[in-house]
């Protein structure tokens, strides 16, 4: 049989079920958030990186044309190389059942035994792929609307079309940039099918593994430069080195930064629940002050009573764990599943590790326990005389502080409203904790809405610089007089030609940078692009040897300024350009802009272009789609090989995918904080009503009706909500700015985002907090209206 002290603990939990439910739910939300983020992060880092390393990713790759087996064998014998393989891929388009054309990149399997890196796992159908069949990477199946055994119409860049059979599926986390983000699907074909499609017999890329220090990126760069040098000595032109972060999935930095941000917010949710524990335990001690006196009078020591209430807090925490741990597992699965759709990996298990469980248990038991120590120790120090001689409700009187004296001067409100106003400030410690809870919830919500506005504004500013409706990239340079016919497409008001190159920066000792820099050769007086300048000026038509650099270049060379010279190696040619302007943006379209006529002459491409920019008369998606289709059809009729066709609307929508994902989860965390804030307010109002039982009875005795009492309680809740909104609105500005800086790291931006403080978010939170305060105050107000004079006489 339980000892009396433990029966008292159970009685306290059971006698006030609303109080118990509020505290348990509040703690559970914080523990759930911890479990969701910690568990989801564990799944992501374990399974995403595990699947990535399982395909045996290369240390680096070097692109070049006409690679043969002899060159591959030469590279395999180089010092520092553990293994190497050559790959061949072709980019084309595939038609979906709806008639849309989507990008498809096919890797040619020439020798299955020689496939050493980025090795796919067969799922269905024959492997390697048979003649006239295509084996799709699994993420391509829903993207293309394909199924095993179905026909897939593909179109090459020269306009030739072929029908292939979907022979099966494979899984390869290393096939390429995720389909959901890149809008490019991946597949595999045999050597015979490649020959049918006209794919050249050689290879166009070399992947290799270093033999030592495989996680040392600097070491990999040294070996990669040696491999590139070997390729160039063979007479081939390097298409650039690609080095990914060793040992982890390419998007690991994004995942780490994003989950860290979610983790910080989940900690706030737990912190807010701790405030409710402080309020609840403080109120419980105040209500049971006579019980404490009786226990002390019959021999209970301070430590016995402290132990009693600590066990009560532990019971709150234990009950919250029963709710939060299963929900945390579901939340972790949901968070990881969202990333599965983006990054294409397998979830091995959702069972939380001992580390995650330990974090949740510590959050559910230790944090509330620590939060309750102060009210428990201070509340149990009361003497027997003080406990039995007081009423337990005498504290919290109004009229002693400066704030109280200021409120006494308010006379223009009705008496019930004055009572609500003064009641709000009776328990200032409790009010402070409740305001802290709601204020934190509000400022996080307003900060998230501001981040959405900042990100959308940043993306909008980027696209406002682009006065182009249709982008057409060609597979090789073409003379512009062959391309001029696209101007005849109905709806086209202007046509501009660009060329794109990739170059390496040259140091004073003539060593090349490991990173390549995109160079856009544009008409200086064109209208398709309006770059915002931070320093210097934009290009002039008469400029020769001039360049405008962007954040993509200055991030690596921050000391570069207007008037400096930059040396580049482009397609084997060494060039020296003078910086005439600098444009800083978080997501620059290129590292350098140069003048098309003069630069193309330097490169031997005078009168040629690799890109076409079309400007339409009506800037809507329907017009853009029609013009893109007609222009592409016209070019193919002229024998022009089109690599990619994009419209502005589609490009902008794709750019918002990652932003919308981040904002969605930040809003989810903000909602959790708001829920904790609402529970905290409901708990505070319930405690206030309980402590004012006698006052409510007096009001009943002098004729106060149910509606009047309910209005007093709800008005008090609304006032607390309004004060928290005002405090949150003031603090939200600096928090929004700091969060803006944090998101720059999440998205690995080259420069600062445009910061926007959203007044819409402030207005939205005002509406939400008023509704939240009304709902949170309704049940306590309803309970208050049910108090009778008989209840008051029986109240202890």
Residues of each region from the PLM?
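Short cytosolic juxtamembrane segments of multi-pass membrane proteins
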Residues: 3, 382-400, 782-796
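Interfacial "coupling" helices/loops that link adjacent transmembrane helices in transporter permeases
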Residues: 16, 275-317, 680-722
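Juxtamembrane segments of multi-pass membrane proteins
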Residues: 60-62, 413-541, 548-552, 564, ...
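C-terminal transmembrane helical bundles of large multi-pass transporters
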Residues: 601, 609-615, 627-630, 634-740, ...
């Amino acid at each position: 049989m339980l000892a009396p002290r433990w029966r008292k603990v159970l009685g306290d939990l059971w006698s006030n079920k609303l109080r118990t439910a509020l505290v348990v739910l509040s703690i559970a939300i914080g523990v759930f958030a911890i479990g969701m983020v910690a568990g989801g992060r564990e799944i992501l880092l374990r399974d995403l990186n595990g699947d990535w390393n399982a395909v045996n990713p290369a240390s680096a790759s070097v692109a070049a044309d006409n690679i043969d087996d002899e060159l591959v064998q030469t590279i395999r014998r180089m010092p520092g190389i553990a293994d190497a393989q050559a790959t061949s891929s072709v980019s084309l388009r595939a038609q979906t059942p709806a008639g849309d054309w989507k990008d498809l990149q096919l890797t040619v399997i020439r020798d299955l035994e020689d496939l050493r890196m980025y090795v796919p796992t067969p799922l269905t159908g024959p492997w390697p792929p048979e003649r006239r069949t295509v084996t799709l990477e699994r993420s391509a199946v829903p993207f293309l609307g394909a199924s095993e055994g179905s026909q897939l119409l593909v179109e090459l860049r020269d306009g030739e079309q072929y029908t292939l059979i979907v022979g099966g599926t494979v899984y390869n986390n290393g096939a390429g940039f995720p389909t959901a983000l890149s809008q490019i699907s991946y597949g595999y074909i045999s050597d015979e099918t490649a020959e049918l499609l006209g794919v050249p017999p050689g290879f166009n890329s070399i992947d290799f593994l270093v033999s030592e220090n495989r996680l040392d990126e600097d070491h990999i760069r040294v070996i990669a430069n040696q491999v590139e040098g070997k390729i160039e000595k063979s007479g081939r032109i390097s298409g650039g080195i690609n080095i990914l972060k060793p040992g982890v999935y390419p998007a690991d930095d994004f995942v780490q930064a994003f989950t860290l941000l979610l983790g910080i917010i989940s900690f706030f949710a737990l912190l807010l629940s701790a405030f409710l524990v402080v309020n609840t335990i403080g109120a419980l001690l105040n209500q049971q002050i006579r019980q404490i006196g009786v226990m002390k009078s019959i021999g209970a020591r301070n430590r016995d009573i402290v132990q009693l209430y600590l066990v009560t807090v532990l019971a709150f925490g234990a009950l919250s764990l029963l709710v939060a741990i299963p929900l945390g597992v579901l939340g972790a699965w949901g968070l990881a599943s969202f990333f599965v759709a983006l990054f294409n990996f397998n979830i091995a298990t959702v069972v939380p590790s001992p580390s995650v469980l330990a974090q949740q248990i510590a959050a559910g038991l230790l944090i509330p326990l620590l939060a309750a120590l102060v009210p428990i120790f201070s509340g149990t120090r009361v003497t027997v005389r003080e406990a039995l001689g007081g009423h337990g409700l005498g504290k919290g009187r109004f009229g002693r502080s400066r704030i109280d004296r200021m409120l006494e001067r308010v006379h223009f409100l009705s008496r019930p409203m004055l009572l609500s106003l003064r009641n709000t400030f009776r328990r200032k410690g409790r009010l402070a904790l409740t305001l802290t809870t709601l204020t934190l919830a509000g400022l996080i919500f307003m900060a998230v809405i501001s981040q959405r506005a900042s990100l959308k504004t940043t993306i909008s500013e980027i696209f406002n610089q682009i006065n182009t409706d249709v982008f057409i990239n060609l597979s090789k340079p073409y003379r512009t007089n062959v391309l001029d016919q696209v101007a005849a497409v109905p709806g086209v008001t202007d046509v501009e030609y660009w060329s794109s190159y990739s170059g390496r920066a040259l140091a004073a000792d003539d060593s090349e940078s490991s990173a390549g820099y995109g160079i856009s050769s544009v008409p200086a007086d064109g209208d398709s692009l309006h770059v915002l300048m931070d320093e210097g000026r934009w290009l002039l038509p008469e400029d020769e040897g001039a360049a405008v650099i962007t954040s993509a270049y200055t991030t690596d060379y921050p000391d570069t300024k207007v008037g400096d010279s930059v040396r580049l190696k482009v397609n084997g040619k060494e060039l020296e350009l003078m910086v005439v302007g600098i444009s800083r943006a978080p997501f620059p379209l290129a590292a350098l802009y140069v003048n098309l006529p003069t630069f193309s002459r330097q490169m031997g491409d005078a009168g040629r272009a690799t890109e076409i920019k079309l400007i339409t008369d009506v800037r809507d998606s329907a017009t853009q789609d029609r013009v893109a289709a007609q222009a592409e059809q016209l070019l193919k009729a002229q024998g022009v090989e089109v690599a990619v066709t994009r419209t502005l609307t589609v490009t902008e929508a794709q750019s918002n995918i990652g932003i919308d994902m981040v904002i969605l989860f930040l809003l989810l965390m903000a909602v959790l904080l708001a829920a904790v804030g609402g529970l905290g307010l409901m708990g505070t109002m319930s405690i206030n009503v309980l402590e004012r039982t006698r006052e409510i009875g007096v009001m009943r005795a002098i004729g106060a009706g149910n509606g009047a009492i309910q209005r007093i309680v709800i008005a008090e809740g609304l006032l607390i909500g309004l004060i928290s909104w005002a405090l949150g609105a003031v603090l939200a500005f600096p928090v929004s700015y700091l969060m803006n800086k944090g998101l720059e790291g999440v998205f690995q931006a080259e420069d600062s985002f445009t910061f926007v403080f959203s007044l819409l978010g402030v207005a939205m939170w005002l509406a939400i907090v008023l509704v939240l305060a009304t709902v949170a105050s309704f049940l306590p107000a309803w309970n208050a209206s049910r108090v009778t004079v008989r209840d008051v006489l029986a109240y202890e």
